[in-house]
Amino acid sequence: MISSCVTRCFGRGKCLPGPATASIYQTIRCISTNSNKAAEAPIFPKLEDVKMHELIGNNNFGKKTYYVERSRTGNLPVYSAYKNGGNKIITEIRKIEGDVIQLRNDLQEQLPFIPKKSWSVVMQSKKIIIKGNAVEAVKRVLTKKF
């Protein structure tokens, strides 16, 4: 049945009036109309039947989740820096992947002795900056979690 369809399409030259893609489309159309069960089974499911968790690449990382990557030597990326000629000390947390705001909120709950006004987030570089020297306290909390 398929061979007769192909010879019928290509033998007379009716399927090759335009570009090659049109001839392939005509051949597939000719084959699919002559087969009994091919047209009944859909190739793709309906859009309403597809669930969100079934999609490839759907992971919820970054929504209320975060990860602090350690350095090559295994240390946490928590650093102190001196600004304004050494008058101002700040603590930086770097290498944050995911939700930076959620990490800041969780750290604020674990470290209530640091005022909330002292915390700031730099979204472009994904850093958390704390006014004052809180390196040891932050490392202690992050060591328990990571």
From Swiss-Prot:
GO terms for cellular component: mitochondrial inner membrane; mitochondrial large ribosomal subunit; mitochondrion. GO terms for biological process: mitochondrial translation. It is found in: Mitochondrion. InterPro entries: Ribosomal_mL49. Keywords: Mitochondrion, Ribonucleoprotein, Ribosomal protein, Transit peptide. One of its GO terms (molecular function) is structural constituent of ribosome. Pfam families: Img2 (PF05046). The keyword Ribosomal protein applies. Its main location: mitochondrion. Residues 1-38 form a transit peptide. Belongs to the mitochondrion-specific ribosomal protein mL49 family. PANTHER family: LARGE RIBOSOMAL SUBUNIT PROTEIN ML49, MITOCHONDRIAL 39S RIBOSOMAL PROTEIN L49. Present with 1700 molecules/cell in log phase SD medium. Component of the mitochondrial large ribosomal subunit (mt-LSU). Mature yeast 74S mitochondrial ribosomes consist of a small (37S) and a large (54S) subunit. The 37S small subunit contains a 15S ribosomal RNA (15S mt-rRNA) and 34 different proteins. The 54S large subunit contains a 21S rRNA (21S mt-rRNA) and 46 different proteins. Component of the mitochondrial ribosome (mitoribosome), a dedicated translation machinery responsible for the synthesis of mitochondrial genome-encoded proteins, including at least some of the essential transmembrane subunits of the mitochondrial respiratory chain. The mitoribosomes are attached to the mitochondrial inner membrane and translation products are cotranslationally integrated into the membrane. This is Large ribosomal subunit protein mL49. It comes from Saccharomyces cerevisiae (strain ATCC 204508 / S288c).
